């Protein structure tokens, strides 16, 4: 099975669907001030036709209500900043392209659009037709839009997904080179770490180059991704997932070879690695780069560690179940996340269960002829 066929969130609206379980409202709340500042700089840059329309894309949009939470924040930021900066002008039409892989459940988003448009008109005064939302399926590691056609590109929790599992893991190091691990965890051998970093560098460089070509000169890009932290004893969600799968091997429910032959196409970069790749690629100026933390159970009101742990397990399952099921089989998925919840219940009370996040705002450098 092709990797892109299983790189999608759980579909539909069931208990383990992405629509029901993914909750990154706190991350969006932390990102919003940066989003508003990015939009403010964009409107001041006087890009082509920006007073008439603004063309935006959300790269790696996923599915369900969270997709439209991002869209809402983008629209609200454009309207708020527009009123502050150019209140004598009419609101520009906003065209938003939702991008994800072909297998993404776009229909779950489209079903929400009628109520979303009505709410936008009620709360923002935006008449239906002044905000146009459509899908642009395809890998964001390839061309999506014509050259110099976009004003603003946004991506949240997507660029840590690689285009493929690093080929060097099998070709150069051999099957099982990443023994006992499912990604480039802290305990991996240096050659495994290098293989993952090399793949991320290649993919992220391609991402920057291709999308810089799609942006107008001085266009903006705002990226939020999971990043490495300095805490030696912290556990991210993939660490807990790895521990859960290892439990099944130790208990005899899963063959060791099955674990050793599985590697997630995910790399969690450091802030310095991201900064260096952007500078080396050269198409963008870094306007600002900051990091922040989000607890796994942030915003969860029930004060019960086991219920919180089940909630975290459901959220992580919504993201990783398709790719796990394609390798390990669907039957063992409940067992994986039952053990995941047990590990989560241990780290949550200690404050060690959180995501480190990086947010970076980029401006496309002008062509020499534009200077």
Swiss-Prot record:
Catalytic EC class: transferase
Residues marked Involved in substrate discrimination (site): 154, 266, 330
Superkingdom, taxonomy of origin: Eukaryota
MF (Gene Ontology): metal ion binding; methyltransferase activity
GO biological process, one term: methylation
Catalytic activity: 7-methylxanthine + S-adenosyl-L-methionine = theobromine + S-adenosyl-L-homocysteine + H(+)
UniProt KW keywords: Alkaloid metabolism, Magnesium, Metal-binding, Methyltransferase, S-adenosyl-L-methionine, Transferase
Pathways per UniProt: Alkaloid biosynthesis
EC id: 2.1.1.159
Cofactor binding mode and count: Binds 1 Mg(2+) ion per subunit.
Cofactor(s) the record lists: Mg(2+)
Positions bound to theobromine: 157, 160-161, 355
Family: Belongs to the methyltransferase superfamily. Type-7 methyltransferase family.
Its job: Involved in the biosynthesis of caffeine. Catalyzes the conversion of 7-methylxanthine (7mX) to theobromine and with a lower activity of paraxanthine to caffeine.
Name the record gives this protein: Monomethylxanthine methyltransferase 2
Organism annotation: Coffea canephora
């Amino acid at each position: 099975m092709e990797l892109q066929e299983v790189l999608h969130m759980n579909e539909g609206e069931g208990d383990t669907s992405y629509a029901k379980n993914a909750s990154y409202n706190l991350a969006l709340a932390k990102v919003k001030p940066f989003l508003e500042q990015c939009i403010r700089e964009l409107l001041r840059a006087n890009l082509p036709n920006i007073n008439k329309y603004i063309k935006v894309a959300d790269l790696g949009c996923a599915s369900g209500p969270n997709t439209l939470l991002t869209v809402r924040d983008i629209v609200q930021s454009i309207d708020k900043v527009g009123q502050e900066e150019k209140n004598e002008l009419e609101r520009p039409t906003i065209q938003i392209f939702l991008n994800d892989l072909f297998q993404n459940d776009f229909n779950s988003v489209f079903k929400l659009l009628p109520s979303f448009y009505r709410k936008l008109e009620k709360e923002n005064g935006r008449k239906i037709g002044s905000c146009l939302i459509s899908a642009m399926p395809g890998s964001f590691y390839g061309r999506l839009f014509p050259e110099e056609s976009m004003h603003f590109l946004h991506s949240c929790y997507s660029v840590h997904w690689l285009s493929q599992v690093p080929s060097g893991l099998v070709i150069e190091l051999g099957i099982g080179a990443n023994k006992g691990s499912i990604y480039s965890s802290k305990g991996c051998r240096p050659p495994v770490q290098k293989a993952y970093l090399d793949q991320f560098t290649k993919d992220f460089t391609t991402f920057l180059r291709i999308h810089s070509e799609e942006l107008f000169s001085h266009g903006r890009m705002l990226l939020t991704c999971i990043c490495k932290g300095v805490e030696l004893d912290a556990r991210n969600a993939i660490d807990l997932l790895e521990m859960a799968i290892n439990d099944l091997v130790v208990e005899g429910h899963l063959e060791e070879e099955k674990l050793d032959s599985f590697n997630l196409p995910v790399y969690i970069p450091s802030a310095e690695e991201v900064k260096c790749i952007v500078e080396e690629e050269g198409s963008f100026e870094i306007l600002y780069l900051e990091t922040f933390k989000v607890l796994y159970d942030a915003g969860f009101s029930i004060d019960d560690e086991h219920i919180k742990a089940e909630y975290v397990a459901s959220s992580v399952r919504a993201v990783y179940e398709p790719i796990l099921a394609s390798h390990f089989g669907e039957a063992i998925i409940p067992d994986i996340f039952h053990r995941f919840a047990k590990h989560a219940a241990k780290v949550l009370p200690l404050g060690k269960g959180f995501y480190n996040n990086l947010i970076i705002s980029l401006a496309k450098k002008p062509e020499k002829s534009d200077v």
